[in-house]
């Protein structure tokens, strides 16, 4: 009995530690975020682009918020942990001020990220016959326009803006993952996705440059996650050719090679921007390597359930992914303890996985250069 009680106490302590906020270690007074569903805290839900989306109801948000918030996870995202580490409130979605009657104070930051967003503009995909697959047209350029509209309410004069943005952190991404996901899930070839990489990188460089011209001094630009470990894409490319899977983690190597290509090009682009803007601190965040820690050694990081199988989904197969029965829809099921899973709904990760990635970033271990 005593052993059982000790186990219960230890387990309860572990769960409580996992749910604790990050200890404030960063010194930013405001955060401005641009991206897609990896960092959207409610804009897609507020946009009304899709009627009654599944992310607008439980089990989304069940772990930390106990309600759906528009985040594509069971709880907090990387941006939430960065806000906690900065001693800031969770960054409000920009559309909250436009779609509700709430009075929103953006002085401490604003989140412009939208789930489903792409780096490239809507017409870029339309010209390639992919417009019907897009969830939203709130691209990176549109998010930049939102920031420009908000800026006059944050500071008025050039000296005032310089003072204000000197203490601000800008996150540009992760963005670009959907530029590849849309064609891949639409059964386009790997070559088609590979050919998009230069266009994606150029757009990220353009928007990062524009933000610096607007006054941004410290910017984090994350790379792509190991998409070959994504449950939805693993199901899409379910292949019996064992040699295409990484023996260390069973992730699909061609997809991860695409992510590596994106990240390599991104790092080169950022190196060029550092030369162009030597006064700005431009930081690459290595989401890929940070995530590969738990994909390679799941049990070491507490993922005793699964890292490749989705916690929430409607599939009967290996990855619990069924396009016609998404997480939160009738017929879907949710695992008992999301903290033991890395994949949340097939596309997005769990709060536990995001916390590990955020910890690596905040410590400086997976940023180049460090920013703490």
Swiss-Prot record:
One of its GO terms (cellular component) is extracellular region. Belongs to the 'GDSL' lipolytic enzyme family. The keyword tRNA processing does not apply. InterPro entries: GDSL, SGNH_hydro_sf, SGNH_plant_lipase-like. Residues 1-19 form the signal peptide. It comes from Arabidopsis thaliana (Mouse-ear cress). This is GDSL esterase/lipase At5g45910. It is found in: Secreted. The active site is at residues 37, 345, 348. Its EC number is 3.1.1.-.
């Amino acid at each position: 009995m005593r052993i059982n009680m000790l186990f219960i106490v230890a387990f309860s302590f572990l769960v409580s530690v996992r749910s604790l906020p990050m200890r404030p270690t960063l010194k930013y007074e405001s955060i401005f975020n641009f991206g897609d569903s990896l960092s959207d805290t409610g804009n897609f839900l507020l946009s009304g682009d899709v009627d009654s989306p599944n992310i607008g109801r439980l089990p989304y948000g069940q772990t930390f918020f106990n309600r759906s918030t528009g985040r594509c996870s069971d709880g907090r995202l990387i941006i939430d942990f960065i806000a906690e580490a900065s001693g800031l409130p969770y960054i409000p979605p920009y559309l909250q001020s436009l779609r509700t009657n709430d009075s929103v104070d953006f002085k401490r930051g604003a989140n412009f990220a939208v789930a489903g967003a792409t780096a490239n503009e809507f017409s870029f995909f339309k010209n390639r016959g992919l417009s019907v697959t897009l969830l939203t047209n709130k691209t990176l350029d549109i998010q930049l326009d939102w920031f420009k509209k908000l800026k006059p309410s944050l500071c008025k004069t050039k000296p005032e803006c310089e003072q204000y943005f000197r203490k601000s952190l800008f996150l540009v991404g992760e963005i670009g993952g959907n530029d590849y996901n849309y064609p891949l899930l639409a059964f386009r070839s790997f070559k088609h996705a590979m050919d998009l990489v230069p266009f994606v990188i150029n757009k990220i460089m353009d928007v990062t440059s524009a933000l610096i011209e607007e006054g941004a001094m410290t910017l984090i630009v994350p790379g792509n996650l190991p998409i070959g470990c994504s449950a939805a894409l693993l199901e899409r490319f379910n292949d019996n050719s064992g040699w295409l899977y990484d023996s260390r983690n069973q992730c699909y190597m061609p997809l991860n090679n695409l992510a590596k290509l994106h990240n390599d090009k991104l790092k080169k682009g950022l190196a060029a921007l550092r030369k162009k803007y030597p006064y700005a601190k431009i930081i690459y965040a290595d989401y890929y390597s940070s995530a590969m820690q738990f994909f390679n050694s799941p049990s070491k990081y507490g993922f005793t359930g699964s890292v490749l199988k989705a916690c929430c989904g409607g599939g009967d197969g290996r990855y619990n992914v069924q396009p016609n029965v998404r997480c939160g829809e009738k017929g879907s099921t949710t695992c008992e303890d999301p903290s033991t899973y890395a994949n949340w709904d097939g596309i997005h990760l769990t709060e536990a996985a995001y916390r590990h990635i955020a910890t690596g970033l905040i410590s400086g271990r997976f940023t180049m250069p460090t920013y703490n």
